[in-house]
Amino acid sequence: MAAIGAATRPLRIALLTSSRFWRGSSNVFAVLGRGLAGRGHTTTAVVAYDPLVGGFQAHSLSVRKLPVGHTSLKGARALRQALGSGELAADVVLVDRARDIRLAAFASLRTPLVVVYCISTPRPPRDLLTRLAFRRVALTVFLTEQLAQRAFAEASFMRRARHRVIPNGVDCDLFRPDEAAGRAFRQRRGLGDGAVLLGVGALEIEKRWDLLLDSVSRVAPPAPPLVLCGTGALEGSLRAHAERLGLDVRFVGQLDSAELVGAYNAATCVVHTRPDEVFSLALIEALACGRPVLAAGGGGTPELVGEAGVLAPAGDPTAFGRLLQDLLADHERRAALALAARRRAVERYSVERMVRDYAEVVEALGEGRGKRG
């Protein structure tokens, strides 16, 4: 990742996530924290659970564990002490979930703490406590314009805060076209030289891998092997489902970044069937690696992919299977999509662009706080 220019005034920035497990938004916070630190700011992740401690430490980010896994008076007081006059003494706190809004709102009652809500869920929070706490939010960051408009339509109270659309970014120097890495991955996994499909993400119900398996089963036999990168509660049921359908599905678990780059470059096509995806980092990584993408055209995916991928009707395995069959048979189209994919990722979804956009708004908010203080 290239160096990014320094800030005018160093800020103390907390990244608050009460998530129990490492999620895509956790990874974004880690990358963002490192990027903002590179601009001269002091960044600290504030978490509730050990998996998050290890995850942020693996990204060389300072971490503080607090009892913020639930909306409780104990957790709120601990957070207020840490972010207010405690060792963190933050100027700005970026929050990940509705619970984090509530906790940060309490922490900001006696200090000019700036709260920034980075929403990454398909639907906005609408419970009464969060609506009241939202009065303390200075800015909401949306991943796509589609997500912003849906949130405003379903939760009009969110219009109280300023907002900005900032797509997530990936390291386009790491995630890049690499034929040698792709060949090596195929060799290690015994995938041969034929077509290979790739899906990346947690093996959880919201990802709708069942739709993907049903879609692949519509391809004229023999269907290409499908590699699934990720872990989760549904692995057993997905294995059974694949066996019933007679599909060759390789469950390879969660891969480190270098191995994941190989997986993307080994893929003939990267496939994604979640119908309400907000913003898939896996699709951005695939674009950065110059891979043809076929995805369900729901949620924020059409805005994310644009003309650099193929969109299928959401929730329709028959249509998805037909489009997949056509794409596998059309080498020229795949080659054109690969070029468009890489170009779109570099132009729109680099880490450098994401950090610059966040730095612009966070530094402006921090300067305003300093003047008020």
Labelled PLM ranges:
Residues 46, 292-295:
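Short hydrophobic beta-strand element within catalytic cores of glycosyltransferases
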Residues 239-255:
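Nucleotide-activated donor-binding/catalytic signature segment of Leloir-type glycosyltransferases, i.e.
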Residues 254-255, 262-267:
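Short alpha-helical donor nucleotide-sugar binding micro-motif in glycosyltransferases
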Residues 275:
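Aromatic "clamp/platform" in nucleotide-sugar-dependent glycosyltransferases that forms part
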Residues 307-318, 326-331:
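Conserved acidic donor-binding segment of nucleotide-sugar-dependent glycosyltransferases
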